[in-house]
């Protein structure tokens, strides 16, 4: 069987107790390549941002008015008129117009600066954490035209420091059936793997042929998060709940002393910071990286060269 579609054999285990023992937390993070935390954020914090994102969708007539607002059901007749190109633009599951409005939300970007989240990564890194400003929202509209995110390593797209970690935070309850995130446990140990082309988000699929790692997954509740190393292979699961929209955030963090690639300081999408910042009240969220002294590493396109997938 192709390892990319092999069923999961591992279940997520709550790493919250490890926060009291930093050395154990670091050992477990290195061994598994990821850590899962139950109820890391309060449900109220998640639902507040979920509401703001759903308001954007409602303004664009993308919610089903006959269903409860917070349930996040899509306006299926309108979604069905969208092209494959619109739905798969930039791998975020919705149109550029919708995404632009989400990127303008101050509270969306503020999530990466949550004191509890920065404290977690300070503990993991053993030094001050730098939160990347290039925050990503996934607004996965329900459509058969939407490509599922293939197995991949984030380092292919981020580069800079390999000790960059992603926090995947669902904006609401996201069970496996709604298209949650699956992690290939221990795959951070395998180094940078070869890739082939794939139509899903990022355009690249990591080739897993001959590797013996096992998939871990589970149902996420609002407030749960999973964090994982840039070399850890992960993938999206298909949305099998008709009509439901899946909302999640990708937030990235690294030790402040480590090098970075310049694109990590740009907006996610063809936007400009000055325009996104219009109407913001928190000056501390604007251009905060300019006070840092980074070593910049050039983007290496050669690691993205594609091979044939032969399993």
Language model segments and positions:
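Non-heme Fe(II)/2-oxoglutarate
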Residues: 2-15, 59, 63, 87, ...
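Short, surface-exposed loop/helix-turn segments at secondary-structure junctions
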Residues: 77-82, 151-152, 200-212, 263-269
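Active-site region of the double-stranded beta-helix
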Residues: 127-130, 153-160, 171-180, 186-188
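Double-stranded beta-helix
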Residues: 3, 10, 15, 27, ...
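Short, conserved beta-strand element in jelly-roll/cupin
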Residues: 158-176, 219-222, 227, 252-256
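Non-heme Fe(II)-dependent double-stranded beta-helix
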Residues: 2-31, 38-151, 157
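Glycine-rich phosphate/pyrophosphate-binding beta-alpha loops
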Residues: 154-156, 164, 235-240
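Short, solvent-exposed loop/turn segments at secondary-structure junctions
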Residues: 41-43, 137-139, 156, 174-176, ...
């Amino acid at each position: 069987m192709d390892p990319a579609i092999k069923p999961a054999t591992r279940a997520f285990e709550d790493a919250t107790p490890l926060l009291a023992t930093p050395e154990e937390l670091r050992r477990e993070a290195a061994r598994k390549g990821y850590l899962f935390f139950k109820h890391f954020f309060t449900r109220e914090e998640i639902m507040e941002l979920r509401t703001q994102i759903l308001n954007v969708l409602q303004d664009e007539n993308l919610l089903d008015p006959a269903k409860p607002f917070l349930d996040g059901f899509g306006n299926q007749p309108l979604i069905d008129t969208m092209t494959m190109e619109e739905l798969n633009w930039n791998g975020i599951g919705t149109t550029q117009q919708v995404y632009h409005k989400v990127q303008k939300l101050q509270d969306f970007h503020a999530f990466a600066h949550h004191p509890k989240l920065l404290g977690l990564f300070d503990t993991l890194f053993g030094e001050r954490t730098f939160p990347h400003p290039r925050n990503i929202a996934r607004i996965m509209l329900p459509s058969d035209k939407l490509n599922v995110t293939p197995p991949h390593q984030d380092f292919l797209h981020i580069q800079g420091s390999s000790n960059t970690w992603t926090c995947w935070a669902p904006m609401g309850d996201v069970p496996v059936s709604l298209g949650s995130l699956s992690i290939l446990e221990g795959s951070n140990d395998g180094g940078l793997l070869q890739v082939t082309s794939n139509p899903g988000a990022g355009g690249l699929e990591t080739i897993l042929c001959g590797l013996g790692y096992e998939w871990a997954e589970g149902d996420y509740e609002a407030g749960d998060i999973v964090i994982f190393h840039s070399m850890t292979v992960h993938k999206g699961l298909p949305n099998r709940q008709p009509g439901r929209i899946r909302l999640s955030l990708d937030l990235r963090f690294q030790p402040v002393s480590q090098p970075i690639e310049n694109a990590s300081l740009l907006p996610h999408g063809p936007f400009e910071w000055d325009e996104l910042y219009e109407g913001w009240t928190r000056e501390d969220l604007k251009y905060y990286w300019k006070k840092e002294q980074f070593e910049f590493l050039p983007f290496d396109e050669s690691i993205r060269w594609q091979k044939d997938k032969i399993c």
